[in-house]
Amino acid sequence: MKKISLLGATGSIGWQTYDILKEQREAFQLVAFSSGKNMEKTREMIDNLKPELVSVQLEEDALLLAKEYPTIHFTFGAQGLVEVATHPASTVLVNAVLGSVGLESTLAAIRMGKTIAIANKETLVTAGHLVMAEAKKYNATILPVDSEHSAIFQSMNGENPKDIERLIITASGGSFRDKTRDQLKHVTVADALNHPNWSMGAKITIDSATMMNKGLEVIEAHVLFDMPYEKIDVLLHRESIIHSLVEYHDTSVIAQLGTPDMRVPIQYALSYPDRIPLHNGQRLNLAQIGQLHFQEMDFERYPALRLAYEAGRTGGTILTAMNAANEAAVAAFLQGKITFLQIDETIERVMQAHQNIAIPDLQTILQVDSETRKIVLDMVK
């Protein structure tokens, strides 16, 4: 039985991980988890899976829960995330927290040689060089949870990376894929949150609509698979059935297919190198689907993807600045402070003004992250 620590338990990926853990009790045991402010979901997880350690966002919630559950240890805040990540009993850490807050706790778990199932794009985007160097140093395994990177990982299994011609990451196009840039001037938050294929959290659904999500995934693929940017392509694929493809020198293309269900890559990262049956999984019926559609990526239609490639090729702290600007701009859009098209514009303005540091340490990354968010807050007032 594998013992699991979970960061970001009450978010979209975390809750789907919980769904797997409660159905696969013979395979996995949850020993520690972190949650935010959702006490209803936190209590449900405690009641169902009885972990040893729980971290919440606020101290008052931790004190309240400690009275209700005297046999469980409760902690809170940023230090609580590190405690969950480094729980001595767990061998696998699922990092499903949103944004760059998962960085320090992930590095702490890596230094203990744990297997990291990483669903937190921002950790790899802002500090990929640190994460992979530390993983190599401490012999920690990094497994992708994103459906696209899981697909690439599976399509590379048993192959020599030197034989790869290119990685092809598929993109649904998001909630506005049939709209022109001109039509996007007046879209609402509710419009943007209506994703055609996937059930995801608000931030990633907006990122999907701007295509920044795919940009982050391109950078993530570069980091995880040590692949140059000129060998990473993005292909529009409306149905989200082919999750990604790997093309080899001999023109062979290996792809991973399946119905759009995030539990599949989550469970694969947990059970790897084994596969176990998925509870209530929907089997793929290609005859029923009938047709799959593909289009070349339009970088003018999706400037956020162009910006992500630019930041990736430049490297250094511009990756942190781009990511922090995006997170802050998306939050401003969700709060009704800026329009949808101003998300891209805000990111570009931040990137143009940024003074890049080529090989940043952790402290520099965190400082740039914090400063960039303040800059965007001032811009959107």
From Swiss-Prot:
Its EC number is 1.1.1.267. It is an enzyme of class 1 (oxidoreductase). GO terms for biological process: isopentenyl diphosphate biosynthetic process, methylerythritol 4-phosphate pathway involved in terpenoid biosynthetic process. Mn(2+) binds at residues 146, 148, 217. InterPro entries: DXP_reductoisomerase, DXP_reductoisomerase_C, DXP_reductoisomerase_N, DXPR_C, DXPR_C_sf, NAD(P)-bd_dom_sf. GO terms for molecular function: 1-deoxy-D-xylulose-5-phosphate reductoisomerase activity; manganese ion binding; NADPH binding. NADPH binds at residues 10-13, 36-38, 120, 122, 201. 1-deoxy-D-xylulose 5-phosphate binds at residues 121, 147-148, 172, 195, 208, 213-214, 217. The keyword rRNA processing does not apply. NCBIfam families: Dxr, PRK12464.1. PANTHER family: 1-DEOXY-D-XYLULOSE 5-PHOSPHATE REDUCTOISOMERASE, 1-DEOXY-D-XYLULOSE 5-PHOSPHATE REDUCTOISOMERASE, CHLOROPLASTIC. This is 1-deoxy-D-xylulose 5-phosphate reductoisomerase. The lineage of its organism: Bacteria, Bacillati, Bacillota, Bacilli, Bacillales. The gene is dxr.
